[in-house]
Amino acid sequence: MEVNIFNIKGEETGRKVILEDSVFRVEPNDYIVYLDVRRYLANKRQGTAKSKERSEMSGSTRKLGRQKGSGGARRGDINSPVLVGGARVFGPKPRDYSFKLNKKEKKMARRSVLSCRMREGGVIVVEDFSFETPKTKEFLDLAKNLKIQIANSKLLVILPEKDDNIFLSARNISKVKVTTVSNLNTYEILDVNRLVILESSVVAINNF
């Protein structure tokens, strides 16, 4: 399909760009999207949670009371799990939560969420731009010109390559994220409701 290209003033340039139907008009696969989001979040987990078990704790191993005759419950040493301050039974251990998906599945997940955003009218293609210096106001002006209400929308800007001035200009705005095509993932697309794609990024995205 063809879509209009806008400039940073929010005006149509009179030019159009083709967004491939194979990327922006596919039938969403909810289960694949779920798997890819789960993979992304699982891979971010540190997995360093650890609690000491009975054999790892210091302290006397002396039995606290005799086995029979006290009238109370049986107790072992001071590290017994049944006592306050004792060891934990089956506590967490360091582990790797990450898992992998096939490339085709990850591509399908990205296509699914891109198609959803396109169907909702949340995709805008803007001609390439940059800022001379990092200024939050310039980025807010850009959003205003594109009729994007930052207060009510979450925005993802997709760059062809890293641009520090654009990144720094948007960093102080809580509902705005900036990424590059090479780092684009399903979770980030799903987490926002508006996408601003720079013109030079379209070719790479069409190859998803």
UniProtKB/Swiss-Prot annotation:
HAMAP family: Ribosomal_uL4_B (MF_01328_B). Disulfide bonds: none annotated. GO terms for cellular component: ribonucleoprotein complex; ribosome. Belongs to the universal ribosomal protein uL4 family. Residues 45-78 are annotated as: Disordered. One of its GO terms (molecular function) is structural constituent of ribosome. It holds the Pfam family Ribosomal_L4. Part of the 50S ribosomal subunit. This is Large ribosomal subunit protein uL4. GO terms for biological process: translation. One of the primary rRNA binding proteins, this protein initially binds near the 5'-end of the 23S rRNA. It is important during the early stages of 50S assembly. It makes multiple contacts with different domains of the 23S rRNA in the assembled 50S subunit and ribosome. Keywords: Ribonucleoprotein, Ribosomal protein, RNA-binding, rRNA-binding. InterPro entries: Ribosomal_uL4, Ribosomal_uL4-like, Ribosomal_uL4_dom_sf.
